């Protein structure tokens, strides 16, 4: 599979989902939010659209995203934004958390407007961050909220779920996960110090990814906070000793 430097981080909101059977059948997408990163740098080239679903929103879903039926009355339908959306994601690595959900809905919408039955994977690579999170944090909660809390990413501005806001949060989470895959377990205060140092030695034999060099100032400050936290909890932090003293 070809990998692209261009990463599109995506999230959607929907009218709801079915608790049994096909989870997306007869439900619709009501918001798509996506942000573009190149070499882990936000470009500002975002995609965002609310969508008129031509059906009512389930009460439980409204409690999650706060989007009302009346708000969507004058919004475009999916087929009206589909061409622009597909052009936007073409030739990219499409980063999604729990991709089965989003991809299922998007393919369902595409199948209703396209006779050729093309899928989203025909336009881009789909990368699911949930399996990666489970690999890094086995046995722990790995929802987007849990990951933001684990990485100390500020979500105070987020009263409801929003596709665009959640896409931006996931982009930050993805940057952390892919930049520090070997050493990320140090952020768990219950990690064994010997394991931490072993991981550090393993990391020292692997060149840093270029994306790490392009981390933003805020991301570097957040990483430094983690390192200081490790030292406070364990009494030692090999990263601070070797690289920052």
UniProtKB/Swiss-Prot annotation:
Q: Name one Pfam family in it.
A: RNase_T
EC? 2.7.7.7
* Chain positions recorded as a divalent metal cation 1 binding sites: 11, 13, 166
Chain sites annotated for binding a divalent metal cation 2 = 11
Query: What SMART domains does the record point to?
Result: EXOIII
- Give me the comment on cofactor binding: Binds 2 divalent metal cations. Magnesium or manganese.
Provide the cofactor list for this protein. Answer: Mg(2+); Mn(2+)
* Catalyses which reaction(s): DNA(n) + a 2'-deoxyribonucleoside 5'-triphosphate = DNA(n+1) + diphosphate
Instruction: Recall the GO molecular function terms of this protein's record.
Output: 3'-5' exonuclease activity; DNA binding; DNA-directed DNA polymerase activity; metal ion binding
User: InterPro entries of this UniProt entry?
Assistant: DnaQ, DnaQ_proteo, Exonuclease_RNaseT/DNA_pol3, RNaseH-like_sf, RNaseH_sf
Name the active site residues: 161 (proton acceptor)
The entry's function note states:
DNA polymerase III is a complex, multichain enzyme responsible for most of the replicative synthesis in bacteria. The epsilon subunit contain the editing function and is a proofreading 3'-5' exonuclease.
Self-association and partners: The DNA polymerase holoenzyme is a complex that contains 10 different types of subunits. These subunits are organized into 3 functionally essential subassemblies: the pol III core, the beta sliding clamp processivity factor and the clamp-loading complex. The pol III core (subunits alpha,epsilon and theta) contains the polymerase and the 3'-5' exonuclease proofreading activities. The polymerase is tethered to the template via the sliding clamp processivity factor.
Query: Which PANTHER family does the UniProt entry name for this protein?
Result: DNA POLYMERASE III SUBUNIT EPSILON
Q: What NCBIfam families does the record point to?
A: dnaq, dnaQ_proteo, PRK05711.1
Please state what the protein is called.
DNA polymerase III subunit epsilon
Q: Which organism is it from?
A: Buchnera aphidicola subsp. Baizongia pistaciae (strain Bp)
As recorded in Swiss-Prot or TrEMBL, the protein's gene is named dnaQ
């Amino acid at each position: 599979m070809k990998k692209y430097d261009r990463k599109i981080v995506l999230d959607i909101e929907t009218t709801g989902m079915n608790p049994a059977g096909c989870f997306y059948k007869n439900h619709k997408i009501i918001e798509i939010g996506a942000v573009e990163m190149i070499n882990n740098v936000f470009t500002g080239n975002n995609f965002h659209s609310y969508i008129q679903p031509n059906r009512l929103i389930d009460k439980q879903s409204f409690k999650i995203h706060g989007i009302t039926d009346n708000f969507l009355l004058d919004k475009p339908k999916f087929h009206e934004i589909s061409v622009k959306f597909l052009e936007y994601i073409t030739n990219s690595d499409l980063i999604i958390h729990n991709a089965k959900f989003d991809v299922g809905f998007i393919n369902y919408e595409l199948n209703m407007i396209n006779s050729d039955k093309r899928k989203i994977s025909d336009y881009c690579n789909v990368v699911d961050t949930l399996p990666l999170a489970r690999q890094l944090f086995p046995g722990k909660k790995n929802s987007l909220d849990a990951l933001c809390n684990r990485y100390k990413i500020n979500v105070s501005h987020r009263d409801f779920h929003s596709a665009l806001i959640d896409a931006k949060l996931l982009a930050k989470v993805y940057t952390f996960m892919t930049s520090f895959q070997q050493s990320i377990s140090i952020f768990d205060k219950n990690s064994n110090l010997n394991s931490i140092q072993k991981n550090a030695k393993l990391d020292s034999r692997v060149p840093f990814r270029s994306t790490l060099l392009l981390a933003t100032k805020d991301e570097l400050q957040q990483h430094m906070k983690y390192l200081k936290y490790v030292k406070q909890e364990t009494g030692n932090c090999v990263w601070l000793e070797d690289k920052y003293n």
